[in-house]
């Protein structure tokens, strides 16, 4: 397949959204890597992030950074043409260290510098790679860039530069890569006869001044700095921790800290107390070990800083043990290219909408997927080897004159959108126990603790304070949603910990009848029915989509690999503001199971089903509190399960009510509009790509958006509480306070059932939360769009929003009309449903539907009364000394409590009537 000046060859890797091919420059025969990204799989936000990522890398030319050579966009794909690294990545290099002597490109290296039996790589090779890595990092730091995902999988290797000058020798390179710039394959440091290292995957890279602090959780867990794992603000020193872990792995052969899950990983780092141990037979020098220990300091203030790192003797000094043939000459031949002297010119033409050839980009959106072991270049055989190709690499003759070189002053790079947080980043136990109302305060305390020591200490106090304030302003936009993101990470970490706990898994095997609720692998793949990814552009919906999650088995591969998934970021600052606006609390987690709450509904319009669709697979989940009396005394564990399930069920009822509003905002697909039978089943696909609202007026759109938003936020709060209660239970369980006497077989069986049921709820809550966040973001955008379309004199028009009425400090603050609250909407709806059910009951119409309506009304009113205490008081049990409880006046709460009691009475009477009718039915059939 031809792509402009390149011919696409065999596939060498595949990711979630992209396929990587080996390619060759048509005229010169030099090799490239071509990543083809399928645009149909990208939502708008992922496209924007990809563009920003390309934009931030424009003008970055360095021999130890993988170059983006060209970028061509067609109607269906984006093709990224990158430098080809024939030796794969450093992780494969270390993994296959015992077979490097058989590879044509590394045979000579192993002959001169054999790998020691007690370590991973020869120290000469280790120091060589470290020098080249530090050269690239210094280049980035001079431009205020932080990579944020340094790991062996993102360090790509090319054959030694000398192999291109070996003629027809045994070590000569047969796959000559296309050059991104003049010095692409001329090392800035290190040994010319050893493989060339290049940093790839700038998916997490962003501009970060030296005194600024970031908060976004990103990176690969095994190599992630502890301050990121602790959800604290961090600076560029986070990269140095990652360098320390990579250096340790090159020396020892494995990462310094390993665990089965992220929570345990952080615990091991903390438990180690900066005592980095090496195997007794490890031959690494004291200088290397000292550097590793200086880099792997838990406290970033104590950690080696960049100037000290760049000036370390291991970086600046000669390499001990280097053979005479490899000793550096007086002047490095950086300008000498291998092969012939003639340089074929690079064409100036571009096909499609392409980025200038100077554009830089890392290898791909999903590095570890694309460069998997199966796609290692060592196993690749090019379809068309460039046997007669000039050995001189091309690509530098047509470099734009304005292309910045390394010697030029640092450029001003745009600040890219914040990167994705890993779906299973760890959450500390104390964070799981923390109440939502104190989360922001306590996190702010931890940030302040760190930020005091982060800037350079040699600056005057006043200047230091000034820079701290400026740094805080620089990341203020990020902080708005990072709190939500951290909450999301905590919840998902807890859900993963629970799902993969040996005790829970043991419970699953002993109590299989409980039936785990399976959850789908991806968000978009399971629910394309309500919103297309092109329209739902919010970060909130993208927290954890696109990667496989664990169901009831322990698959942890994705835990230690960064995956963009279907969407690269987590909850947005706007969602955070919406949450603040509507409930005063911050929530975040992610998921959405393919539930059928919209099927078989009776009223109101758009197939709203008043009965909760909360999953009750195999009777493992209980719904209580609807008037039925408890027949047995419940132990503490069973009560906990009931409280969690009740809270989740209430959230499901609120979610169903919000769906009514949401679906009216989405135009029906043409097939549903023309098919009457399809209109009765709203689980069909909806087209959200259009910008029209059907027959809705602007006022109606704004009203529906406001109501849907506050209802979704209420559902989020209930889901968050369910997870908090489960977190408290799990903490007690880990302290041995939950299951009782382990010797008792009955207690053990009960504990297994409890663990299984709670795990089912936790996984369901995680999935539902992601769906709610996704839809809340869509509604938020609809609300903003609708408010802008209102007449200028309308109270809800943005020009009429006062500073005091808006929440947040950004340009995307959300303002809802006065009186629009979830509690009022829920109360009115419950009252309407109960009245309609009472009328039908009196007339004897649809008694089964009356029962459903009564139960749903009770659940909705219980949600109004729900408090934030964990484990908290039940509905109706309120501290009467408070004038206001969760935004509801005490007098109003009493009215709601009385209404709940009244509906419970009607429900009991109705069920007695239904029982009598059920007994009569068999008798009547016999008589017939």
Curated annotation (Swiss-Prot):
Reactions this protein catalyses: L-seryl-[protein] + ATP = O-phospho-L-seryl-[protein] + ADP + H(+); L-threonyl-[protein] + ATP = O-phospho-L-threonyl-[protein] + ADP + H(+)
GO cellular component: Atg1/ULK1 kinase complex; autophagosome membrane; cytosol; phagophore; phagophore assembly site membrane; vacuole-isolation membrane contact site
Enzyme class, first EC level, given as a word: transferase
SMART domains from the UniProt entry: S_TKc
Topological type in the membrane: Peripheral membrane protein
Region: Disordered, residue numbers: 318-470, 544-571
Stored InterPro entries: Atg1-like, ATG1-like_MIT2, Atg1-like_tMIT, Kinase-like_dom_sf, Prot_kinase_dom, Protein_kinase_ATP_BS, Ser/Thr_kinase_AS
Residue ranges of every copy of the Protein kinase domain listed in the record: 6-315
Keywords for the protein's UniProt record, in alphabetical order: ATP-binding, Autophagy, Cytoplasm, Kinase, Membrane, Nucleotide-binding, Protein transport, Serine/threonine-protein kinase, Transferase, Transport
Localisation: Cytoplasm; Preautophagosomal structure membrane
Pfam families: ATG1-like_MIT1, ATG1-like_MIT2, Pkinase
Gene Ontology biological process: autophagy of mitochondrion; cellular response to nitrogen starvation; cellular response to potassium ion starvation; piecemeal microautophagy of the nucleus; protein localization to phagophore assembly site; protein transport; regulation of autophagy; reticulophagy
Gene Ontology molecular function: any one: ATP binding
Catalytic residues (UniProt): 149 (proton acceptor)
Positions with biased composition (Basic and acidic residues): 359-371, 459-470, 548-564
EC number: 2.7.11.1
Chief site of localization: cytoplasm
Polar residues bias (residue ranges): 437-452
UniProt: ATP binding residues: 12-20, 35
Function per UniProt: Serine/threonine protein kinase involved in the cytoplasm to vacuole transport (Cvt) and found to be essential in autophagy, where it is required for the formation of autophagosomes. Involved in the clearance of protein aggregates which cannot be efficiently cleared by the proteasome. Required for selective autophagic degradation of the nucleus (nucleophagy) as well as for mitophagy which contributes to regulate mitochondrial quantity and quality by eliminating the mitochondria to a basal level to fulfill cellular energy requirements and preventing excess ROS production.
Annotated family: Belongs to the protein kinase superfamily. Ser/Thr protein kinase family. APG1/unc-51/ULK1 subfamily.
Quaternary structure note: Homodimer. Forms a ternary complex with ATG13 and ATG17.
Protein name: Serine/threonine-protein kinase atg1
């Amino acid at each position: 397949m031809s792509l402009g000046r390149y011919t696409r060859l065999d596939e060498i890797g595949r990711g979630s959204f992209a396929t990587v091919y080996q390619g060759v420059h048509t005229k010169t025969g030099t090799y490239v890597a071509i990543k083809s990204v399928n645009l149909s799989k990208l939502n708008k936000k992922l496209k924007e992030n990809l563009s920003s990522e390309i934009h931030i890398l424009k003008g970055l030319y360095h021999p130890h950074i993988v170059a983006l050579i060209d970028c061509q966009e067609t109607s269906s794909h984006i093709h990224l043409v990158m430098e080809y690294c024939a030796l794969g990545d450093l992780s494969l290099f270390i993994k296959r260290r015992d077979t490097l002597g058989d590879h044509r490109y590394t045979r000579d290296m192993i002959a001169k510098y054999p790998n020691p039996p007690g370590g991973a790589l020869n120290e000469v090779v280790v120091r060589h790679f470290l020098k080249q890595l530090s050269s690239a990092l210094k280049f980035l730091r001079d431009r205020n860039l932080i990579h944020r995902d340094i790991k062996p999988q993102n360090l790509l290797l090319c054959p030694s530069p000398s192999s291109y000058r070996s003629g027809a020798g045994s070590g000569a390179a047969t796959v000559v890569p296309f050059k991104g710039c003049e010095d692409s394959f001329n090392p800035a440091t290190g040994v010319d006869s050893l493989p060339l290292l290049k940093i790839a995957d700038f998916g997490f890279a962003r501009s970060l001044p030296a005194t600024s602090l970031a908060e976004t959780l990103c990176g690969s867990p095994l190599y992630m700095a502890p301050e990121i794992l602790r959800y604290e603000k961090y600076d560029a020193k986070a990269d140095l921790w990652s360098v320390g872990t990579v250096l340790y792995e090159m020396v020892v052969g494995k990462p310094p800290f390993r665990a089965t899950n992220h929570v345990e990983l952080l615990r091991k780092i903390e438990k180690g107390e900066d005592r980095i141990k090496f195997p007794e037979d490890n031959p690494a020098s004291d200088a290397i070990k000292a550097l590793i220990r200086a880099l792997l300091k838990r406290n970033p203030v104590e950690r080696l800083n960049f100037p000290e790192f760049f000036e370390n003797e291991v970086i600046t000094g000669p390499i001990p043990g280097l053979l005479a043939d490899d000793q550096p000459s007086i002047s490095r031949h950086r300008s000498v290219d291998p092969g012939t002297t003639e340089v074929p010119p690079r064409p100036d033409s571009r096909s499609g909408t392409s980025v200038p050839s100077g554009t830089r980009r890392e290898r791909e959106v999903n590095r570890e997927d694309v460069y998997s072991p199966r796609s290692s270049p060592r196993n690749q055989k090019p379809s068309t080897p460039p046997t007669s190709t000039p050995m001189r690499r091309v690509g530098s003759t047509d470099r734009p004159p304005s292309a910045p070189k390394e010697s030029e002053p640092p450029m001003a790079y745009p600040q890219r959108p914040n990167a994705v947080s890993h779906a299973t980043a760890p959450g500390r136990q104390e964070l799981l126990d923390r109440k939502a109302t104190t989360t922001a305060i306590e996190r702010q305390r931890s940030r302040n603790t760190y930020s005091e020591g982060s800037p350079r200490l040699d600056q005057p106090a006043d200047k230091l304070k000034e820079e701290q304030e400026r740094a805080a302003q620089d990341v203020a936009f990020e902080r708005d949603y990072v709190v939500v993101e951290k909450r999301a990470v905590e919840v998902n970490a807890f859900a993963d910990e629970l799902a993969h706990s040996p005790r829970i898994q043991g419970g699953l095997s002993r109590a299989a009848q409980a039936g785990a609720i399976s959850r789908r692998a991806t968000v978009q793949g399971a629910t394309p029915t309500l919103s297309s990814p092109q329209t739902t552009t919010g970060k909130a919906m993208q927290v954890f989509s696109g990667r496989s999650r664990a169901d009831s088995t322990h698959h942890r591969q994705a835990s230690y690999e960064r995956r963009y998934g279907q969407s690269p970021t987590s909850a947005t600052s706007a969602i955070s503001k919406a949450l603040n606006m509507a409930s005063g609390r911050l929530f975040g987690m992610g998921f959405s199971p393919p539930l059928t709450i919209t099927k078989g509904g009776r009223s109101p319009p758009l197939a709203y089903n008043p009965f909760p669709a909360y999953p009750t697979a195999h009777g493992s989940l209980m719904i209580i509190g609807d008037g039925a009396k408890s027949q047995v005394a419940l132990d503490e564990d069973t009560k906990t399960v009931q409280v969690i399930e009740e809270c989740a069920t209430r959230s499901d009822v609120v979610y169903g009510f919000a769906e009514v509003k949401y679906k009216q905002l989405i135009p029906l697909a043409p097939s549903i509009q023309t098919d009457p039978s399809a209109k009765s089943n709203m689980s069909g696909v909806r087209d959200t790509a259009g910008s029209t609202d059907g027959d809705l007026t602007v006022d109606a759109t704004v009203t529906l958006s406001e109501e849907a938003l506050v209802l979704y936020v209420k559902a989020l709060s209930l889901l968050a509480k369910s997870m908090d209660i489960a977190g408290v239970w799990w903490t007690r369980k880990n302290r041995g306070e939950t299951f009782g006497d382990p010797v008792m077989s009955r207690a053990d069986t009960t504990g297994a059932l409890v663990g299984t049921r709670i795990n089912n709820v936790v996984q369901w809550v995680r999935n539902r939360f992601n769906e709610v966040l996704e839809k809340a973001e869509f509604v938020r955008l609809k609300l903003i769009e609708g408010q802008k379309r209102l007449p200028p004199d309308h109270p809800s028009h943005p020009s009429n929003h006062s500073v005091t009425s808006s929440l947040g400090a950004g340009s995307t603050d959300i303002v809802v009309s006065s009186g629009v609250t979830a509690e009022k909407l829920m109360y009115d709806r419950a009252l309407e449903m109960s009245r309609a059910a009472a009328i039908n009951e009196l007339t004897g119409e649809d008694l089964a539907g009356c029962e459903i309506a009564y139960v749903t009304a009770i659940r909705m009113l219980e949600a109004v009364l729900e408090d934030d205490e964990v484990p908290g008081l039940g509905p109706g049990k309120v501290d009467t000394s408070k004038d206001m409880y969760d935004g509801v006046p005490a007098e109003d709460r009493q009215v709601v409590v009385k209404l709940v009691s009244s509906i419970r009475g009607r429900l009991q009477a109705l069920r007695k009537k239904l029982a009598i009718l059920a007994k009569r039915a068999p008798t009547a059939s016999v008589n017939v």
